[in-house]
Amino acid sequence: MSSEVIKRENVEVTLKVVVEAAKFEEAINKAYNKMKSRFNIQGFRKGKAPRKIVEKFYGVEVFYEEAFNIVFPEVYEAALDEHNIDPVDHPKVDLEDIVAGQDVVFTAVVEVMPEFEVADYVGIEVEKKEYNVQEEDIQRELDGLAEKNSRMITVEDRAVKEGDMVIIDYKGMVDGIAFEGGTAERQSLTIGSGQFIPGFEEQLVGKNIGEEVEVQVTFPEEYHAEELAGKAAIFEVKIHEIKEKEVPVIDDEFAKDVSEFDTLEELTNDIKKNLEEDAKNRAIQEQRNDVIEAIANKVELEIPSAVVNRQIDNMLADFDYRLQFQGLNLEYYLQLTGTKEEDLREQMRPDAVKTVKNELILEKIGAKENIVATDEELEEQLEKMAKQYNQEIEKLKTNLRQQDLNAIKEGIIIRKTVDFLAENAKLI
């Protein structure tokens, strides 16, 4: 076997590999022994026909594909080792026409991590960030707490208005025919939430309990149910209940009810303290991000598409995981929004490229500065994970693969590298 690098361009390397005719002949014999039971040729018991007879009936190339599959892993790995190539994904293989008795030649195009250098990363100048807590910030938190502790109460002496919750029955029809999913009983709907088709909720404003209302709407052109998109519909609606939100008064009693404090002043001071801590952490995190961005802006490198695609896979999986906390999943989200997964992936691509680039740069700096993850730091991180997943740490360790542990260590190194860069940055 012989090999050579015939092209190296950015993150793409093209290898040419030659397999000696004798070695490929051995692979053909192995392929014959593996496949011979498939052939049923007259005059021979099934699987007993000699190789030459099988080739005569089915063509000399009958075993070529399997023979190549047999020989490829060995010669491909040998070529990678010879040229010190570490691919990030499977190769794109182009096999030249195979001629009996001659050497077999193929090319393999692989992506590799980019080669680059990072310099002048110590003492990076970034703007000092500072966020001050204002009275309106504290009031916003108090209002949010009051809103969270509000309750819905039934009203009977007035008509529906914006912000009310109504309990309704409805039956939708297109061209006088009821459609699937268009009928419900005692459905709750908050007026102004945009939960229903545009124009539906507004037509209930001013109506009273017990009224039967004919609501006329047109489904949006981009509506997820294609058979309804753009069509006019009539909903027969009956209003059973009207409820309004009762928000508690923000006073000492409120503070006692919603917190561990006895007075509103104590609650307010605690909120202020937490907001100031959040503001401080926000400033620190933004400064850290600015340091990374300033360094990354000075480095030009191409990211292998396979690595970017894997990062997008991770981002999609994380997005799907977060959707599940809202009672959704990725498939339903795509259907609901009329978005194709390919389009969503493309929307994520710029962030994926940025994430991978930053990680590569931080890994390079970490290696130059001899930053490592100690056993104690790994153990501390595993303890945090065990607590997060509500799991015994020994059980967690048992379930983790070596590659998982390596990824955790890499995360620790990246965090420590950012710490190093932030500590050595100049705030201006």
From Swiss-Prot:
Note the NCBIfam families from the entry: tig (TIGR00115)
Q: Name one GO biological process term.
A: protein transport
**Into which family does the record put it?**
Belongs to the FKBP-type PPIase family. Tig subfamily.
Top-rank taxon of the source lineage equals Bacteria
Chain's gene name: tig
**InterPro entries named in the record:** PPIase_dom_sf, PPIase_FKBP_dom, Trig_fac, Trigger_fac_C, Trigger_fac_C_sf, Trigger_fac_ribosome-bd_bac, Trigger_fac_ribosome-bd_sf, Trigger_fact/SurA_dom_sf
Keyword flag Isomerase: yes
Subcellular location(s): the record lists: Cytoplasm
Which residues belong to any copy of the PPIase FKBP-type domain? 163-248
What function does this protein fulfil? Involved in protein export. Acts as a chaperone by maintaining the newly synthesized protein in an open conformation. Functions as a peptidyl-prolyl cis-trans isomerase.
Q: What is this protein called?
A: Trigger factor
UniProt source species: Alkaliphilus oremlandii (strain OhILAs) (Clostridium oremlandii (strain OhILAs))
Principal subcellular localization:
cytoplasm
Assigned EC number: 5.2.1.8
Q: Name one GO molecular function term.
A: ribosome binding
Q: What is known of its domains?
A: Consists of 3 domains; the N-terminus binds the ribosome, the middle domain has PPIase activity, while the C-terminus has intrinsic chaperone activity on its own.
User: Which reaction(s) are listed as its catalytic activity?
Assistant: [protein]-peptidylproline (omega=180) = [protein]-peptidylproline (omega=0)
For this UniProt record, give its keywords in alphabetical order, as a comma-separated list. Cell cycle, Cell division, Chaperone, Cytoplasm, Isomerase, Rotamase
Q: Does the keyword Hydrolase apply?
A: no
Q: Which SUPFAM superfamilies match?
A: FKBP-like (SSF54534), Triger factor/SurA peptide-binding domain-like (SSF109998), Trigger factor ribosome-binding domain (SSF102735)
Any one GO cellular component localisation term in the record: cytoplasm
